[in-house]
UniProtKB/Swiss-Prot annotation:
The protein, known as: Actin-like protein 8
Biological-process GO terms, alphabetical: axonogenesis; cell motility; epithelial cell differentiation
Keyword field: Cytoplasm, Cytoskeleton
Family the entry assigns: Belongs to the actin family.
Superkingdom field: Eukaryota
Cytoplasm as UniProt keyword: yes
MF-aspect GO terms: protein kinase binding; structural constituent of postsynaptic actin cytoskeleton
One cellular component term from this protein's GO annotations in UniProt: axon
C-alpha cells in the first residue's frame, strides 16, 4: 500500500503531511482555519462564511483550531484541511490511499466520523487510522520502550512492549506547548495580552524558538540570568517584528522549565520525568529496566536546548538511579509520528489494518 500513500499527521498545533517514503513531510502548516465573510451570498444561511487556511490578516479574530488538546472540536475545519492536503497530492484526478494518525483520546464516535469524511466526502480509495504514539515508536526502529511525546496540545507518556502499548500504563498531561505560549503571552504583554493579536502571537513564537531553553538547575539558572541582566547582557534582549526591542526576564528565558516543574507555573502535575517513572512502575517488574533504558523523546517541546539532557539527569538522579536510563533523541523527532507512519505504509504485516471503500460500504450496510 506504500505506492503514493499520503500520510496526514494532524496534531493540535500543526498538520504534517506528505507522501510515504520521504525523509520528512512535504507540507507542514498550523492547525488553523479561518472563516471569512462570503460576499457572494450575504443572506442568513450557512454559506455566508467561507473556510480558508491559516489566519487572515484582515479578519484576525475569525480563526479556529479544529483540534484542541488532541480532541476534534471542529469537523468542518478538519475536512477542509484534509481536502487541502489531498488536492495537493492528487494526480490525474486520482485520490491516493491515506494514513491518518489519531490520538488515543479520540471519542468512540470520532473514528466513524473520520471514515465518513474520508470515504464519503473526500472519496479516498483506502484508509489506515494509526495511533500517534505507536507511530513514534516505529520511527525509532524499536519495539519496546517508553514514548514521551510533548506537542502543542498534550504531553503523553506510553510504555510499549513488542510494538504494543502496555495496558493501563499510559499518562496524559494537559500541559504542553500551548500552555508555554500562554505563559509567555501573559508575561510579555500583561493586561494587554490578546491571543488573537497577530503581532503578539508572532512575538511569542519568536521568543520560544530563539530565546527559550531548559535549565539544568532552575535556581542556578535564575541567579545566572539575574547577573547577566544587571550587566546589560545583549542575550537577554531581542528585536520584535515591528523593530522595537524587548528585554526578557530570567523566568521567561527558562519558561520550558514548565515541563519539569509544572507547579512553579501553576500547572497540574506530575512533571514529565515523574510521569515516566509512574508509567514504568505500573508495568511488570521484569520489564522496567528495559523500558527505562529506551525512553524516546519526541514532539516539538523536546527540541528546546537542554530538554533531553535534563530529562536524563532527572531520570538517573531522582527517580530510577538503580537502573541505567537512556533517552533516545532523533534528529527529526518533531516529525516522528509522521515518519513512523511512513514506515508502516511499507509493512506487509499492516495490510489487514487497512480499510477499503468497499469494506466501508459493507460495514455501513450491516
Amino acid at each position: 500500500m506504500a505506492a503514493r500513500t499520503v500520510i496526514i499527521d494532524h496534531g493540535s498545533g500543526f498538520l504534517k503531511a506528505g507522501t510515504a517514503g520521504w525523509n520528512e513531510p512535504q507540507m507542514v502548516f498550523p492547525n488553523i482555519v479561518n472563516y471569512l465573510p462570503c460576499k457572494e451570498n450575504p443572506g442568513p444561511s450557512y454559506a455566508r462564511r467561507r473556510v480558508s487556511l491559516g489566519i487572515d490578516i484582515c479578519h484576525p479574530d475569525t480563526f479556529s483550531y479544529p483540534i484542541e488538546r488532541g480532541r476534534i472540536l471542529n469537523w468542518e475545519g478538519v475536512q477542509y484541511l484534509w481536502s487541502f492536503v489531498l488536492e495537493n497530492h492528487r494526480r490525474e484526478q486520482e485520490v491516493p490511499p491515506v494514513i491518518i494518525t489519531e490520538t488515543p483520546l479520540r471519542e468512540p464516535a470520532d473514528r466513524k466520523k473520520m471514515l465518513e469524511i474520508l470515504f464519503e466526502l473526500l472519496h479516498v480509495p483506502s484508509v489506515l487510522l494509526a495511533d500517534q504514539l505507536q507511530m513514534s515508536l516505529y520511527a525509532s526502529g524499536l519495539l519496546t520502550g517508553v514514548v514521551v511525546d510533548s506537542g502543542y496540545g498534550l504531553t503523553r507518556v506510553q510504555p510499549f512492549h513488542q510494538g504494543r502499548p502496555l495496558p493501563a500504563s499510559g499518562k496524559t498531561l494537559e500541559f504542553a506547548g500551548q500552555d508555554l505560549s500562554a505563559y509567555l503571552l501573559k508575561s510579555l504583554f500583561k493586561e494587554d495580552c490578546d491571543r488573537r493579536c497577530l503581532f503578539q502571537l508572532e512575538t511569542v513564537a519568536v521568543t520560544q524558538m530563539n530565546k527559550c531553553y531548559v535549565p539544568q538547575n532552575l535556581g542556578e539558572a535564575l541567579d545566572f540570568r539575574e547577573r547577566q541582566q544587571s550587566a546589560l547582557d545583549e542575550s537577554n534582549t531581542y528585536q520584535l517584528p515591528d523593530g522595537s526591542r524587548v528585554e526578557l526576564t530570567p523566568m521567561q528565558r527558562v519558561a520550558p522549565e514548565m515541563f519539569f516543574s509544572p507547579q512553579v507555573f501553576e500547572q497540574p502535575g506530575p512533571s514529565i520525568p515523574r510521569a515516566i517513572v509512574e508509567s514504568v512502575e505500573s508495568c511488570e517488574i521484569s520489564l522496567r529496566p528495559l523500558l527505562v533504558s529506551h525512553v524516546m523523546a519526541c514532539g516539538g517541546n523536546t527540541l528546546y536546548p537542554g530538554f533531553t539532557k535534563r530529562l536524563f539527569r532527572e531520570l538517573m538522579g531522582d527517580h530510577v538511579s538503580s537502573t541505567k536510563a537512556t533517552v533516545w533523541e532523533g534528529s527529526n523527532r518533531n516529525f516522528s509520528v509522521w515518519l513512523g507512519a511512513s514506515v508502516v505504509a511499507h509493512l506487509s504485516t499492516y495490510q489487514s489494518e487497512w480499510m477499503s471503500r468497499e469494506e466501508y460500504g459493507e460495514h455501513m450496510r450491516m
